[in-house]
Amino acid sequence: MRTRYRMERRALLTGGTALALTAVAGARVPLAQTLDKVSFQTNWRAQAEHGGYYQAVAAGIYRRHGIECEIRMGGPQQNPAQLLLAGRVDFIMSNGFQALNYVREGLPFLTVGAIMQKDPQVLMTHEGNGINSFEDMKGRPILIGASGRVTYWPFLKAKFGFTDEQIRPYTFNVGPFLADRMAIQQGFISSEPFAAQQAGARPRVFLIADAGYQNYQTTIDVSQRMVNEKKDLVQRFVNATIEGWSAYMKGQDVAGANAAIKRDNPEMDDAKIAYAVQVMNQAGIVASGDALTMGIGAMTEARWKSFYEGMRDVGRYPAGLDYAKAYSLEFVNKRVGLA
């Protein structure tokens, strides 16, 4: 499917597409209030997996925090990190790997919040074919994309004994999967399984995060300069984003956000959006782990340390990397959005 997000799709953005969303009528913003204008770059086309940001715009949450937020939709031709480096955007959507890349490459950027506690990446196969666990996949061909080979694949190799000889090219469609009952392919829990179901298959899904893969996803990344010079603005943006995600995942007045998603990305429809939200809730993609007690966006030093060390041990990052420069806990873990 092409309706997904991720740095895994060669890094992102539709060329020059910038879509400013208008808050719903009735948002309680004094007419004389001066709003701080910010831009937020997503890493793929609009979809439910970006819903909390759209909710924060559509429901006037950013405006209540004194922010006018322009969501710039991603796509296959541009790279959010490069846009951040060039100073063309204020915040970007990213992941834990990119944050460690900043440190390795000496770039002055960092992660200030992690919306998804679980990376939505899955391997999926067909029900009833005898493949009932990751262990059962050892030695079998698996359709894997280029980015997956340098992110979750080393983890799977180390944990389950997978080998590079198992890799087959993944072309970002479910056609080969549908044609082979023994097929195993990568996907996102909220995307490819739905496409397979719509085509009449019965996919069985294995969430890599549930096997111990600790990558944070849908992170909020920003420049160190903005953190230093506009700390209050960063905090307000993070708080408003968390409130948007809390409302969106609970289904609270989400019609405006969903309409904006469908307007920005006509490939989206109500069924795809509903499925994505349902499975994200069921799997605890956003609300699980530390987020249950500290609020959506939660991050911890212990998890960052464990993630870095795991990726170091499989050769993804060098020993001695100052991984603590990749993130700041200053803006999260405040129980924002919790009842």
Regions found by a protein language model. Name each.
Residues 162-167, 265-278, 317-325:
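Short, surface-exposed acidic
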Residues 1-6, 31-33, 339:
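Basic/polar N-terminal segments that are highly enriched at the extreme N-terminus
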